[in-house]
């Protein structure tokens, strides 16, 4: 057997007849499967033990030899070799076909490989192969054309005319095989290359296609005649099993039926040939044999599929590979695993960040082997069998052992759908009673989990290495930041936010205001005994908190704060400033001086002079967590988060906030606002009836009126709200709900969407406090159903987008430290019109500079070339007034098959420089795909006034960008750099003409009359600039400008869509994806290289091909960059395993086989498929070839490991 972890590459080619014979262990001559009386396989049948091996381990068919000691002996009675039964999964047989048969993949695929090789049309081929026409093979001295078709009648006439034997014409696959044998590859290729020099149009395209196929045969060493089969391999019987069902009936794989048909027809054909049967009967049998083999290889590809019982099409060999249920996606890319469990999740508020609760019964089953080993080691049982009995009986002693076993053994928890890598995290198990898994409340956001019946799967990492990786790399406490934007993903939510919000509220005149305490304990004592309220403003001695970073002027003073804030600050990391105001200045620069009493000052005076601060909201807590992480990294942050969670839950319980109908306020002037809107709508309808506006205009005006009415109510609601109202507190803190929910409770529900996406004109005037009328309720449910269906469709769409993204970028891995490129990317803030969608500061964080950045006024060097830009540095650059910076970018990285560390920058999930081996492609794909469900589905209908196009937004726009489709509402772009000299309107054709004067000439562009212009006369425009509003077609932009412009444009467009929906994604993720779309070039002129014109190839391969030619002084090849959508890019990857497992499996494999493609196993998918460890992370060669050293020889590196000790 090949050692799967040793081989370097994998090749696929056509199998020659001799190769098939060398695989085979014998010929299958009979269509029988098993004897239904004895249930033994029939001799020479499809399950024959002589050919395929014994059905029982170490036992021949007749039973003469049993036991392992006869290993390798071939029984003299039954001829079966004594060996393991599993050889029945490996040994193949064969069928000697009595007539050649064409392979349907090569004849029927698009383009037909057989047709291109022979220069015949697929129609002609079909007529010949299925015995409808003769083809002239050798005209000899007759005037017939080679490869011309003759009908039966014409053939007989020609025979009479020229005499028997004067020419050779045949029909069937045999004829095709003869023609294929006659193809002289070298001569044909030379001839086509000559033809290409002069050909153009259709002729050229066809020549390029033929040249491609012939060249593939020539280079791969495959012979064209192997596309026709003379011998058919039979796959091992255990891969097409036959199992007995309870009722004594049998269930067999469809393949057995298909093989039986082939054998039956083959045997019948052999008999007919022996009997010298009439030609027409033999021909018919040959055609049936051809059809039987077609059905076996790819049933349904030609004609009607062969059906089984209940007219179900049989599953052929091709179907075994294709689709979600095929071999690739079902068994190779994802397998079911042992040592796993699944249960409902419940909340575990008492757990630490790195813990999860595992039910006892589940744990004992999952850790059974470990427990059994310990039982034997402790000599509670003599052997493993007895230990197993002990566990199954539920002996008392096993529970103590289980506690020991799981102590340092992390488990993985996974929630489907796993949209990003935070969907699987490691935890230390804690045994609990009950049957539900307990999950820490803070990791819910990463999993997108809630406790309304969600289920999660649990897995046990078995090997030492797996446990170490789970503990060091996957522990939940390590995953504080979200890989997509580097912001904390573990922000408290709901009750935790509400508790901390309530705790940090301030209130004037509450009991205990103005009291001064010597330390925290005294303040808490006063609060517990009812002398001071949580919200009352009191004084505390600064010296009681010596570890806080006070300014010198603040020490030894009294500080004004609240009892709640004393408690709140008590859980903060010691080195963080005392948080008195919910803003970043307090967090980064320290507590403001105004809260400190000067000696002899009256505390009440100071209190009266201070404004009441707003409490800490969800966003503030997020900022505190981010700052904590930045300063103290993982261990301290996760411990702090647990303290924050406990404090939040505790005080949320004490606060006892509830919601009753009385908490929903009544808006005093609601009737006035609604009457005014009714009045306005009536006026609009009057104007419409008089013909003063179109129906579209009227619709927009009416909906706008109602929208404004709703906004007016909302505004009034905010003005009159009571900050102590529980609903307002929930909304304001960010714990639950937003102003829109609140205004539906207290204002009006507003306009609803109809199922077709159009907004209905009749609004719902009531709110939920008043209750809805029957008609309003109907409209309301109408809109709600639309929402539900949208969500369901969106989820599927978004999932498919993620799959395509992962597929195209799965082989992008950080391969080296620095690629040494001298190119960079000039970046500035991304704007949409006047609006800034992404600031320069955000874009600079965590990137390396390409050139040094200077202060625009003083000329001082702010940061040198090739330096990492930190958050503080980015702020400094922007504050200095710099508007554009040249940075290292994934777009310009010169690393092959991946990216280098400097071009990528920091890893957003850790905040540190990215490590070599990080699978950045997959992370990028997940970061873009995961928020896909949050994007809207709709294409906005602007009511036909503002523009003549529908603006595509949300998910459809993202798909449009990544698939490089022509956008809806395309903008007209200029190909000339110069000035707009004239815009003339032509009423007759309803168009405008824009004239751009450049140095080389005048550009004239026709624009639709209704399009909104982006330029005016006198404006200076660059090549590729949009003249009208709308999206630019990226392929056009690539023709006019260069690759980098297209990449920059696509990056900006993706960011616009996500940022407009409030989703932040790091630029680098989009860069990785966009770069994959522009990896290929098309060869235009091959020069002196041996490339073929029109070939699509990787940029790096093209450069290599040119390098040698340039060195030897030849003419290099020229090429043009090609922009491909992600689906096409995935299929065009260099790895045929990855492409075949993605889509269009048969086409990919057909093509790969003809070319004799080699897969060098560089990506992740290929390695998962063949079962090798993936070449990313710790699976990279550089991390695997490790020499162990004694501990005392090297210094022990202190890793920020979070474990039970962190308590």
UniProtKB/Swiss-Prot annotation:
Chain residues that bind Mg(2+): 450, 452, 454
CDD domains the UniProt entry points to: RNAP_beta'_C, RNAP_beta'_N
Gene3D superfamilies xrefs: 1.10.132.30, 1.10.150.390, 1.10.1790.20, 1.10.40.90, 2.40.40.20, 2.40.50.100, RNA polymerase II, clamp domain (4.10.860.120), RNA polymerase Rpb1, domain 3 (1.10.274.100)
GO molecular function term, any single one: DNA-directed RNA polymerase activity
Classification via PANTHER family: DNA-DIRECTED RNA POLYMERASE (PTHR19376), DNA-DIRECTED RNA POLYMERASE SUBUNIT BETA (PTHR19376:SF54)
InterPro entries attached to this UniProt entry: DNA-dir_RpoC_beta_prime, DNA-dir_RpoC_beta_prime_bact, RNA_pol_asu, RNA_pol_N, RNA_pol_Rpb1_1, RNA_pol_Rpb1_3, RNA_pol_Rpb1_3_sf, RNA_pol_Rpb1_4
Protein name: DNA-directed RNA polymerase subunit beta'
Enzyme class: transferase
EC identifiers of the protein: 2.7.7.6
């Amino acid at each position: 057997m090949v050692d799967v972890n040793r081989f370097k590459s994998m090749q696929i080619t056509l199998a020659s007849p001799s190769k098939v014979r060398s695989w085979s262990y014998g010929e299958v001559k009979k269509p029988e499967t098993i004897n239904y009386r004895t249930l033994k396989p029939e001799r020479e049948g499809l399950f024959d033990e002589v050919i395929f091996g014994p059905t029982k381990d170490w036992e021949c068919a007749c039973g003469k030899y049993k036991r392992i000691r006869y290993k390798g002996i071939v029984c003299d009675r039954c001829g079966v070799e004594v060996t393991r039964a599993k050889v029945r999964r490996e040994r193949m047989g064969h069928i000697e076909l009595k007539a050649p048969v064409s392979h349907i993949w090569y004849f029927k695929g698009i383009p037909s490989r057989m047709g291109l090789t022979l220069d015949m049309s697929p129609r002609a081929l079909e007529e010949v192969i299925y015995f409808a026409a003769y083809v002239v093979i050798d005209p000899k001295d007759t005037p017939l054309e080679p490869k011309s078709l003759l009908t039966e009648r014409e053939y007989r006439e020609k025979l009479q005319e020229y005499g028997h034997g004067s020419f050779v014409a045949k029909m069937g696959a045999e004829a095709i095989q003869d023609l294929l044998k006659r193809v002289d590859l070298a001569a044909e290729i030379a001839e086509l290359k000559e033809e290409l020099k002069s050909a153009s149009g259709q002729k050229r395209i066809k020549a390029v296609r033929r040249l491609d196929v012939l060249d593939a045969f020539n280079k791969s060493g495959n012979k064209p005649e192997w596309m026709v089969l003379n011998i058919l391999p039979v796959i091992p019987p255990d891969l097409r099993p036959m199992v007995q069902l309870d009722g004594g009936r049998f269930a067999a794989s469809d393949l057995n039926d298909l093989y039986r048909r082939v054998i039956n027809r083959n045997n019948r054909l052999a008999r007919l040939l022996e009997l010298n049967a009439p030609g027409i009967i033999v021909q018919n049998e040959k055609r049936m044999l051809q059809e039987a083999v077609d059905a076996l290889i790819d049933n349904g590809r030609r004609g009607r599929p062969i059906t089984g019982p209940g007219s179900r099409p049989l599953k052929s060999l091709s179907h075994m590979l294709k689709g979600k249920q095929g071999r690739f996606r079902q068994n190779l890319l994802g397998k079911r695993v042992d040592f796993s469990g699944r249960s409902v999740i419940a909340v575990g508020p008492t757990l630490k960040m790195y813990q999860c609760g595992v039910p006892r019964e589940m744990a004992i089953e999952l850790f059974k082997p470990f427990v059994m080993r310990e039982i034997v080691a402790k000599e509670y049982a003599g052997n493993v069998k007895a230990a197993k009995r002990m566990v199954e009986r539920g002996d008392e002693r096993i529970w103590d052992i289980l506690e020991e076993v799981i102590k340092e053994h992390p488990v993985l928890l996974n929630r489907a759908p796993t949209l990003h890598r935070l969907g699987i995290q490691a935890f230390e198990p804690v045994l609990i009673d009950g049957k539900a898994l307990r999950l820490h409340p803070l990791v819910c956001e990463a999993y997108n989990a809630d406790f309304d019946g969600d289920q999660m799967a649990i897995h046990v990492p078995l090997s030492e290495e797996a446990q170490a990786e789970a503990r060091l790399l996957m522990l939940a406490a390590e995953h504080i930041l979200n890989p997509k934007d580097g912001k904390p993903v573990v922000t408290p939510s709901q009750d935790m936010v509400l508790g901390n919000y309530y705790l940090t509220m301030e209130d004037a005149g509450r009991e205990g205001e103005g009291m001064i305490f010597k330390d925290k304990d005294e303040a808490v004592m006063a609060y517990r005994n009812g002398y001071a309220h949580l919200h009352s403003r009191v004084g505390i001695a600064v010296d009681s908190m010596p570890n806080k970073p006070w300014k010198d002027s603040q020490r030894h003073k009294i500080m004004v704060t609240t009892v709640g804030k004393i408690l709140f600050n008590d859980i903060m990391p010691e080195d963080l400033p005392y948080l008195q105001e919910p803003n970043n200045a307090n967090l980064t620069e320290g507590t403001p001086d105004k809260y400190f009493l000067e000696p002899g000052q009256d505390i009440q005076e100071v209190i009266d002079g201070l404004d009441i601060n707003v409490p800490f909201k969800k966003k503030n807590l997020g900022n505190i967590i981010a700052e904590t992480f930045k300063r103290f990294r993982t261990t301290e942050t996760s411990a702090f988060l647990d303290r924050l969670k406990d404090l939040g839950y505790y005080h949320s319980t004490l606060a006892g906030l509830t919601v009753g109908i009385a908490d929903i306020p009544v808006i005093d002037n609601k009737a006035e606002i609604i009457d005014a809107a009714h009045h306005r709508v009536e006026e609009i309808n009057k104007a419409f009836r008089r013909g003063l506006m179109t129906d579209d205009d009227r619709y927009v005006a009416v909906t706008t009126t109602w929208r404004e009415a709703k906004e007016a109510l909302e505004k009034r609601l905010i003005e009159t709200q009571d900050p102590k109202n529980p609903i307002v507190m929930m909304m304001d803190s960010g714990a639950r709900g937003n102003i829109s929910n609140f205004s539906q409770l207290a204002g009006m529900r507003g306009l609803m969407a109809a199922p077709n996406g159009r907004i209905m004109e009749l609004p719902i005037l009531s709110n939920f406090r008043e209750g809805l009328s029957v008609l309003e309720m109907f409209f309301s449910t109408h809109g709600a159903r639309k929402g539900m269906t949208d969500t369901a469709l969106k989820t599927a769409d978004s999932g498919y987008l993620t799959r395509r993204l992962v597929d195209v970028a799965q082989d992008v891995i950080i391969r080296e430290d620095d690629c040494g490129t001298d190119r960079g990317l000039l970046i500035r803030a991304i704007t949409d019109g006047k609006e800034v969608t992404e600031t320069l500061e955000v874009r600079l964080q965590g990137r390396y500079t390409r050139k040094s950045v200077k202060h625009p006024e003083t000329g001082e060097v702010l940061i040198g070339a090739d330096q990492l830009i930190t958050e503080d540095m980015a702020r400094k650059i922007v504050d200095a007034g710099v508007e554009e910076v040249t940075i290292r970018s994934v777009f310009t990285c010169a690393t092959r098959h991946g990216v280098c560390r400097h071009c990528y920058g920091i890893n957003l999930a850790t905040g540190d420089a990215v490590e070599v081996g990080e699978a950045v492609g997959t992370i990028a794909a997940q970061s873009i795909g995961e928020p896909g469900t949050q994007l809207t589905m709709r294409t906005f209908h602007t009511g036909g006034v503002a523009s003549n196009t529908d603006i595509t937004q949300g998910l459809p726009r993202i798909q449009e960008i990544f698939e490089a489709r022509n956008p809806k509402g395309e903008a007209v772009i200029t190909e000339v750099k110069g000035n707009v000299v004239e815009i003339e309107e032509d009423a007759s054709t309803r168009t405008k003409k824009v004239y751009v004067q450049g140095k080389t000439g005048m550009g004239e562009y026709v624009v639709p009359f209704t399009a909104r212009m982006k330029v005016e006369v006198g404006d200076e425009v660059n090549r590729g600039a949009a003249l009208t509003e709308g999206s630019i077609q990226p392929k056009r932009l690539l023709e006019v400008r260069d690759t980098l412009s297209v990449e920059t444009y696509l990056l900006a467009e993706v960011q616009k869509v996500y940022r407009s929906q409030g989703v932040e994604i790091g630029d680098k993720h989009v860069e990785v994806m966009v770069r994959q779309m522009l990896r290929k070039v098309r060869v235009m002129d091959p020069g002196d290289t041996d490339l073929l014109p029109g070939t699509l190839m990787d940029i790096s391969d093209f450069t290599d091909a040119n390098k040698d030619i340039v060195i030897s002084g030849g003419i290099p090849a020229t090429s043009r960059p090609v922009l491909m959508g992600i689906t096409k890019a995935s299929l065009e990857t260099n790895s045929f395993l990855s492409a075949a497992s993605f889509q269009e499996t048969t086409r990919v494999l057909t093509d790969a086989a003809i070319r004799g493609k080699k897969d060098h196993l560089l990506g992740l998918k290929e390695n998962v498929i063949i079962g090798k460890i993936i070449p990313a992370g710790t699976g990279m060669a550089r991390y695997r070839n490790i020499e162990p050293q004694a501990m005392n020889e090297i210094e022990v590196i202190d890793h920020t490991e979070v474990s039970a000790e962190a308590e």
